Amino acid sequence: LALEPMADALAAGNAVCLKPSELSPNTSKLLAELVPQYLDSEAVRVVEGGPKETGELLKCPFNHIFYTGGGHVGKIVMRAAAEHLTPVTLELGGKSPCFVDRTADINVAARRIAWGKFTNAGQTCVAPDYVLATPDVAEALAERIAVAITEFYGEDPKASPDFGRIINDRHFERLCKLLPVGTVPSEEPSSPLVQVASAVGAAMDMVGRRFNAVTTGRG
């Protein structure tokens, strides 16, 4: 999310000031170390820091600002850019539904939905938020999604090196509050919906545990 816009800007002949997220300090530190080794420091500078440093950075009269993140910070970026009439590209979060009907390959659709939803623990702006399926394929799709989740992350997702961790405590607490809302008490234990919920629940149970990755090992 940081490197692709940087590459585009450089390819178009621009200089770049790159500010990685403070929520992933290890990645930020790595970029600050690697970028000067491989790219001209006159063309690319990496700035580390938190909200205070970002606020100071936004006071500069850039020619263009490209921001990827949440809506709250997006508003701050837009207000700061307005002081200099700086053009802004905001790549914010959104709702991403999937629609599946009988023309789809159910196995392929299920695997792609499961992959898209759980990559980086769903912390991407294009992660599917919900699935709309026609009645003639809904049951088969639900069954295949449950299978796909288990295939990707195993019966015990916390042991999977491919299942991401939640990036900060605030987001972790928000997800924990949402978990009771997602229960389906009226469904039979063998129903496809419960099978999906069980597979998701196994993954969410892992998310709901406070591992070192949540507090000290952030990427």
Located regions from the model:
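A structured beta-alpha segment of the ubiquitous adenosine-cofactor-binding alpha/beta core
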Residues: 45-63
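Periplasmic-binding protein-like
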Residues: 7, 64-68
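Hydrophobic/aromatic ligand-binding patch that stacks against planar heteroaromatic rings
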Residues: 8-9, 56-57, 80
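Phosphate/pyrophosphate-binding betaalpha-module
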Residues: 39-45, 59-60, 68, 72-75
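Short beta->alpha connector loops at strand-helix junctions that form conserved
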Residues: 14, 19-21, 48, 68-69, ...
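Conserved small-residue-rich beta-alpha loop and adjacent elements
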Residues: 1-42, 85, 107
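ALDH superfamily catalytic-core signature
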Residues: 39, 72-219
